[in-house]
Amino acid sequence: MKISEEEVRHVANLSKLRFSDQETKEFASSLSKIVDMIELLNEVDTEGVPVTTTMADRKTVMREDIAQPGNNRDDLFKNVPQHQDYYIKVPAILEDGGDA
């Protein structure tokens, strides 16, 4: 399956990434090869092969959930340069608030 340069540009734009024309071309080529390899896996005969969900022979071990006193908020905010109403103010990273 061929991944077009336009598709790479579209996904890059959604991810707020910018690539040169050469990088876009290389990504399109690399991604096309990756998708082709994955499509090859669909051709593998798995008839009679037991389903494997994990190779680890472990079980989830959960600890008892016990509430513990937290930290003092005033102490936590001592080194925060800008805050308001116990929220940390950080610089904007998306132009115009973003569209994501």
Swiss-Prot record:
It comes from the Bacteria. Keywords: ATP-binding, Ligase, Nucleotide-binding, Protein biosynthesis. GO terms for biological process: glutaminyl-tRNAGln biosynthesis via transamidation; regulation of translational fidelity; translation. InterPro entries: Asp/Glu-ADT_sf_sub_c, GatC. GO terms for molecular function: asparaginyl-tRNA synthase (glutamine-hydrolyzing) activity; ATP binding; glutaminyl-tRNA synthase (glutamine-hydrolyzing) activity. It is an enzyme of class 6 (ligase). Allows the formation of correctly charged Asn-tRNA(Asn) or Gln-tRNA(Gln) through the transamidation of misacylated Asp-tRNA(Asn) or Glu-tRNA(Gln) in organisms which lack either or both of asparaginyl-tRNA or glutaminyl-tRNA synthetases. The reaction takes place in the presence of glutamine and ATP through an activated phospho-Asp-tRNA(Asn) or phospho-Glu-tRNA(Gln). HAMAP family: GatC. This is Aspartyl/glutamyl-tRNA(Asn/Gln) amidotransferase subunit C. It comes from Streptococcus agalactiae serotype III (strain NEM316). The lineage of its organism: Bacteria, Bacillati, Bacillota, Bacilli, Lactobacillales.
